């Protein structure tokens, strides 16, 4: 190495190592600033952090309470829904039973009307047949009597009275015979 470089190296100090008096002053300033921050700023920071922690814990408690209440409301809703379904089912069964009873009563009424109409028709047909039979029997009896006697029985009024009286006697005998059975 050249002697000049050696002299220059000795005269130059290392730029990375600060001088000792600056280092002491910087360290004292750091302790003062750190002490000030620890006394004034750190309690405020701790206070804000504590408030935040309490708010979070309170929010969690509120959320848990809300969740518990929501679960309770949900269970009440389910119970009410089940009760409403049960009531609806019972009401539908009652309405169905009522409808069936009404339909049976209506069917019974219609059946009785049909039977009554059938009996009335049979009675009317019986009367019509009896009337037609009475006329035919009257004609046959008159003709037969005319053939037996040998002369014509022309008096219709008298003839009708005799035939009606005879047939009424037959009806009375038939009615008493049926009543004694």
From Swiss-Prot:
The chain crosses the membrane at residues 16-36. Its main location: membrane. It is found in: Cell membrane. Keywords: ATP synthesis, Cell membrane, CF(0), Hydrogen ion transport, Ion transport, Membrane, Transmembrane, Transmembrane helix, Transport. Signal peptide: none annotated. It comes from the Bacteria. InterPro entries: ATP_synth_B-like_membr_sf, ATP_synth_b/b'su_bac/chlpt, ATP_synth_F0_bsu_bac, ATP_synthase_B_chain. One of its GO terms (cellular component) is plasma membrane. One of its GO terms (molecular function) is proton-transporting ATPase activity, rotational mechanism. It is a single-pass membrane protein. Pfam families: ATP-synt_B. Belongs to the ATPase B chain family. F(1)F(0) ATP synthase produces ATP from ADP in the presence of a proton or sodium gradient. F-type ATPases consist of two structural domains, F(1) containing the extramembraneous catalytic core and F(0) containing the membrane proton channel, linked together by a central stalk and a peripheral stalk. During catalysis, ATP synthesis in the catalytic domain of F(1) is coupled via a rotary mechanism of the central stalk subunits to proton translocation. Component of the F(0) channel, it forms part of the peripheral stalk, linking F(1) to F(0). F-type ATPases have 2 components, F(1) - the catalytic core - and F(0) - the membrane proton channel. F(1) has five subunits: alpha(3), beta(3), gamma(1), delta(1), epsilon(1). F(0) has three main subunits: a(1), b(2) and c(10-14). The alpha and beta chains form an alternating ring which encloses part of the gamma chain. F(1) is attached to F(0) by a central stalk formed by the gamma and epsilon chains, while a peripheral stalk is formed by the delta and b chains. This is ATP synthase subunit b. It comes from Streptomyces lividans. The gene is atpF.
């Amino acid at each position: 190495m050249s002697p000049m470089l050696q002299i220059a190296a000795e005269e130059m100090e290392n730029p990375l190592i600060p001088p000792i008096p600056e280092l002491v002053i910087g360290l004292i300033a750091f302790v003062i600033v750190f002490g000030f921050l620890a006394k004034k700023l750190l309690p405020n920071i701790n206070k804000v952090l504590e408030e935040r922690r309490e708010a979070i814990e309170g929010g969690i408690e509120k959320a848990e309470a809300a969740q518990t209440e929501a679960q309770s409301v949900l269970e009440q809703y389910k119970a009410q829904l089940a009760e409403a379904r049960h009531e609806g089912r019972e009401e539908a069964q009652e309405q169905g039973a009522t409808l069936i009873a009404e339909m049976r009563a209506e069917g019974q009424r219609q059946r009785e009307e049909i039977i009554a109409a059938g009996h009335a028709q049979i009675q009317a047909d019986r009367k019509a047949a009896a009337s037609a039979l009475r006329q035919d029997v009257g004609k046959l009896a008159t003709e037969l009597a005319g053939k037996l006697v040998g002369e014509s029985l022309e008096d219709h009024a008298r003839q009708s009275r005799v035939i009606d009286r005879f047939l009424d006697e037959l009806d009375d005998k038939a009615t008493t015979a049926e009543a004694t059975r």
